[in-house]
A protein has these predicted regions:
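Conserved PLP-dependent catalytic core of the aminotransferase class-I/II
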Residues: 174, 178-203
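Catalytic P-loop NTPase motifs of RecA-like helicase/translocase cores
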Residues: 80, 108-110
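A short glycine-threonine-serine/GTX helix/turn-capping micro-motif
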Residues: 144, 161-170, 187
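Conserved PLP-anchoring active-site segment centered on the Schiff-base-forming lysine
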Residues: 13, 23-43, 197
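Short loop-beta-helix segment that forms the pyridoxal 5′-phosphate
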Residues: 1-22
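Active-site PLP attachment segment
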Residues: 123-157, 170
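Active-site phosphate-binding strand-loop segment of PLP-dependent enzymes
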Residues: 55-103
């Protein structure tokens, strides 16, 4: 799964919601301030999180001179939308803010990117020090479960988290099904792409 997403490492859990909450639990110890994009899913909700935008402008807190570690929370494709969000605005944040980006790819994994790998691997903004993705596998993959992907250090931290160790894992049969159906997922994604291009020619 990590190879498909093009991440260094990944692990599965019982749901996308749990994936988000576990990732946030680890990041809470490493973050001075959280910021969230509009319409961010509940899986990435933090009570102390500040809005990324105030009005139609960047939150002034993102532009001040305070050196701090911040985590930005967002869906890659928010609910009720069909296009991925534009993350280039993160380049406007000054270098004194050490940025971790946590994205929810529940509505893009299996749909966007090469062969449906999502957009995680395409996020390469110079201002981002660390990027992490979580997703539900119950959308395009049709299997109950969730995934957390990122760099090896972060995933190793996840594996040692007491909450992760004691939580329910993804159904083993579903994990095996996902591996066995790799070729089928690829075929179906190619079919989807072809059908969308066909529809697009008549719109």
């Amino acid at each position: 799964l990590a190879k498909f997403i093009k991440a260094d490492a990944a692990l599965t859990v019982s749901s996308g919601m749990l994936a988000g909450k576990l990732a946030l639990e680890v990041l809470a110890y490493q973050t001075d301030c959280f910021f969230h994009f509009p319409d961010t899913h509940t899986a990435l909700k933090v009570n102390s999180s500040l809005p990324f935008f105030v009005g139609h402008k960047l939150n002034p807190r993102l532009l001040d001179s305070v050196s701090e570690k911040i985590t930005i929370l967002t869906d890659t494709v928010p609910s009720f939308r069909t296009q991925a969000i534009d993350l280039s605005i993160l380049n406007s944040i000054p270098a004194n803010k050490e940025i971790t980006l946590l994205v929810d790819e529940s509505h893009s994994l299996g749909i966007l990117g090469k062969n449906g790998c999502g957009i995680y691997s395409d996020i390469s903004l110079p201002t981002i020090k660390r990027k992490i993705m979580i997703a539900s596998l119950g959308k395009a993959f049709g299997l109950t479960g969730g995934v957390i992907a990122g760099d090896k250090d972060f995933i190793n931290e996840m594996k040692n988290l007491d909450t992760f160790i004691s939580s329910a894992g993804m159904n083993a049969a579903f994990v095996q099904t996902m591996a066995d159906a790799a070729a089928i997922y690829l075929q179906q994604h190619q079919k989807l792409t072809t059908n969308l291009k066909y529809i697009d020619t008549y719109l």
